[in-house]
Amino acid sequence: EMARQAARESIVLLENKDNILPLSKDMRTIAVLGPGADDLQPGDYTPKLQPGQLKSVLTGIKQAVGKQTKVIYEQGCDFTSLGENNIAKAVKVASQSDVVLLVLGDCSTSEATTDVYKTSGENHDYATLILPGKQQELLEAVCATGKPVILILQAGRPYNLSKASELCKAILVNWLPGQEGGPATADVLFGDYNPAGRLPMTFPRHVGQLPLYYNFKTSGRRYEYSDMEYYPLYYFGYGLSYTSFEYSGLKIQEKENGNITVQATVKNIGQRAGDEVVQLYVTDMYASVKTRITELKDFTRIHLKPGEAKTVSFELTPYELSLLNDHMDRVVEKGAFKILVGGVSPQYVAKDRIKDSVGYADSKKGLSGMLEYTHEFAAD
């Protein structure tokens, strides 16, 4: 049960167009496709396990639905091969279904099985972010059937999901989910568990954006590309839910010892119970050296029933506001700090005075406030 709960809590919902998820367990036909659908992905350095200990996504789907639902499986292609494949068979199966669950991504099981070519893990870097092998071709061919496609990215790294975000009705990332990954994924797909995972990394639009991370330092120059959008596809800290939350009552107070207390109230304004990952970010507005656009300082995960509200409290220490000055001494400087609390990382407008734009579009995303910090601490 612990493995199943850990897998459920880590799943990140990236897209849910027209609220297609959660699915009904009474659907007539579900196609489960892709090289990861009936493959076991416990992750790197996994010891050999006993038969039956690991459950695939296909197994989880079959266990979740009723007897009246027909589940059809077709691999379509393997993880890496560019040669012979069964994409045509997968397309045929997809065209006969009510919904398609397409499981693509990585293979990282060489410690548990033999004769498997890994695509993720130690010593397996990739020069591209396109899905390996024929997986991208499989995705586009299946989506061309017109059937609603839900992409399950079972991976240990970000991939370029630009095309998938256009074509798929929903996208979720279940990573390399371990021995109970299949049932945990089914729990999210059918609404037995409300997803609340957040991205611990940034998903770029293109490999040309790398390195790409949320807490970059401002350059004082232009932030743009001539041939594509500057911003990432999915931001660090991003993730959707089957319910909605609203933030209010942000309070920021500087204490005599230099600590800062931050409070905000979070309310579930939707119709489903669910978790919210409340994230605390800080932006140092002006400093003696260049500082990062924003930085995650703390987070907490809370559970709220429909209509329920909770007040979340954080405490920042002076060290968490400190920087390395031009002498490489760690110091704390007084001045303006922007304090941000929300369910996702704050957004920004990539132009001059970029820090001024860091914030949230509305109270459903989060809140921000300014603090004129009065303490100064020099290096020991």
Give the role of each language-model region:
Residues 4-380:
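C-terminal non-catalytic regions of proteins with extracellular/luminal or membrane-system context
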